[in-house]
Structures are given as structure tokens and as C-alpha cells.
Amino acid sequence: MDKKVFRSSTRPAPPRFSKNSPRGYPPRGYMERLAKQVLWAESDGGSWYKHLMNPAPIPSGAPVIVAQAPCRADLAGGTIDLWPLYLFHAGAVTLNFAVNIVTTCRITPLKGKRIYFHSVDTHKDEEFADLEALRTGKRFRHPLAARMVQFFAPKEGFLLETDSESPAGAGISGSSALMIATTAALARFTDRNLTLEQMRVIAQNVEAQIIGVPTGCQDYYPALYGGISSIHLDADGIHREAVPIAPEEIESRFVLAYTGAPRKSGINNWEVFKAHIDGNKRVFRNFERIAEIAGAMHQALLRSDWEGVARLLREEWKLRRTNAPGITTPLIDKLIAVAGKNGGRAAKVCGAGGGGCVIFLTEKGASSRVATAIGENGGRVLPLQVARNGLRYASA
């Protein structure tokens, strides 16, 4: 990139996202201003922008497609949702709830065959002359979009934009939620009438292709359905049950905090997965207990037995630390200790751990005190609101 050209004050101001627009949606006129940028680049030698998008994408006039899906916080039974681990533990179940931290996929149909990718949150851009050029690619700046498009194989050109409100490496399933949003948007764009379960299978399998290790199933259900879920992992399939708890009960008792440390969920899960499959008896026994804890926590939630939920959450965290010592960090240990002195009853990392987010269960009425203590000791408290609904299509 020619830095002198990039810093030129003569080029038009680049199109920006409006603070008043829904997150991830370009304001009206975005594509037109983008075209002006390319025209300037062609006339004034702005090679950096010519490389970014040349020729300028021209909307076809077909409707823009926008799909959104929420992230999640997991309570119990994680990692056991990896196939075939749950088949070795009778009655395996995993518990989680959707949080109103949203991912978005937006598809703008274009004239011609060119394909453009733009990630709003990671600032990554990529383009291809046509589908065949994308199919022959080996490495991608936006692998999620690229792999999904390879699967759906749309015939026409388009601009695919993604955005996620989740912090990087948070462990709240931002990537899986975005997989669901992208699956839904591309299915609609290619006129594929998929059920929610078909979307789950596609998203889970393509994500495994991207990260190169097995993926669990639990992350996709909050993105699809929202609410509080008990996901039963049986030999005849996976079955999602809505847990009938008022969302306000969850919101008043839990705090979600980001530790700022990125994590490698595939690596952490893969190490535990291998140990289980290799016959590590200690890991097997721990998973037996994790399955029992998840089942017991499901019943405790149904009874609104929050003391029981706290006890089980503490026990699950202890077992997870035994299975994978790298699941915690000094900051996580510090925040859990600080929370315990201010009304926190239990805590665990979200996802595979090694950093990212921690979910804290507090005494009734103590959530604000716990949140303040976490913020004063290096954690970043995220807004915690249960997403009442899962996947939805929004107007452009």
C-alpha cells in the first residue's frame, strides 16, 4: 500500500457507518460514496482503493438481506457437546442462555459476478472476480464468509458484510452466532428453504472445516432460538428444550465480564477431546461428573433453587480446571476471588477458557456491587440481557 497516496488529503472522505444506524448496517448512500472513492482512485492514482474494490460494486436493485443472531453464556455441560463424547455419558445435557450481544450478516446483491467481503468489526476486506476465483482460493482474509459462500455457491455477485458486538476471543460464541446469521442470509440469497436444524448442521460443519478440529453443537441453539436452553444430547439426535425461567431472574443474578485475554477455543477443547478419546480415565470420570452436574443444574433451575445452582456451578468450574489447567488465568482467578468478597456466589469461564469472558452468579441484589468490584480490578463488565429471540431477519 502506498502510504503517501493513502494519506492524501485530496481524496473524498470514505463512507462511514452512522452511529444512528443499527449496528452493522451502512447508512443510505454508502454504496454511492464507495463508488466515488473508486472513481477518485482511478483518476488520481489512489492504488490502495483500486486494490480494495475495483471495479466499484453496483447494487442490482434486488432486496438487501440482513440476518442477526445473538451470542450466548454457557452454564454447564460444555465440551461434552462434542460428538461423539456425549454418546459415552448417558443423559448428557448442556445448559446456556442467549445474550443480547448480536452478530449480523448483510448481503447486498450486485450487478455482475464479483464477490466482495467486508468485516465491520475486524476491518478486513476481500474480493473475488467470481465464484470460481473464490473456489480456487486457499487462504482467505475472511474465512467464515469464504467457506460459507463456497458451500452455498450463489450464481450472482454480491457484497457480504459481517459484524459482531462480541469482543475478540470472548468465549461467548460470537463466531458460531455469526455462522448462523451468515448461513441464514446466504440461504435466503440462494433461495434455499432451510429448517433451523438444517442451518445448525451446516453452520457447525463449516465451522469445523474452518478451525480444523471438532465443534460442539451447543453454541448454535441460542443463536437460533434465543432464551434459556437445555440441550439434550442423545443417541437419536440433539433435542433443545426451553427452560421456563423468567429472563429477568437471570438478568438480576448474573454478571458477565470480559478479561481481555484472547483464547484458543479449538486448541483447549481439542486437548481435552483427545484425552477423552485416548482413554484417560481421570478425564472420563470428570466428564461423567460434568454430565451429572448439568442434569442436576437443569432441575435446580426448574425449582428456582439458586443456592443449588451456585453450588453446582462451583463444582463444575473445579472439574474444568482439573481437566484443563490452562482454562484459567491469574486475572480470572483474581476476579473470581474479588467477586466472592462482594456477593458473588459462583463463577466459571465461558466457552473453552484460557481468557475471554467469565460469568458470575451473585446473591439476589448484589449484581451491581459485584460488577463494580470486577470493573475496579481489571475486568470489563458487559451488558447482560437475555436475548428473548434468536435468529431474525431485519429490514435493511
Regions found by a protein language model. Give the residues of each.
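Short pre-catalytic strand/loop immediately N-terminal to key active-site residues, enriched for Gly-Thr
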Residues: 166-170, 345-347
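General small-molecule cofactor/ligand-binding pocket signal
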Residues: 161, 185, 382
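Glycine-rich active-site/cofactor-binding loop and its immediate structural neighborhood
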Residues: 355-357
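C-terminal nucleotide
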Residues: 6, 14-76, 80-83, 87-88, ...
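DPxDG-like acidic metal-binding loop motif
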Residues: 172-192, 196
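Glycine/charged-rich beta-loop-alpha catalytic/anionic-binding loops adjacent to active sites
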Residues: 126-133, 158-168
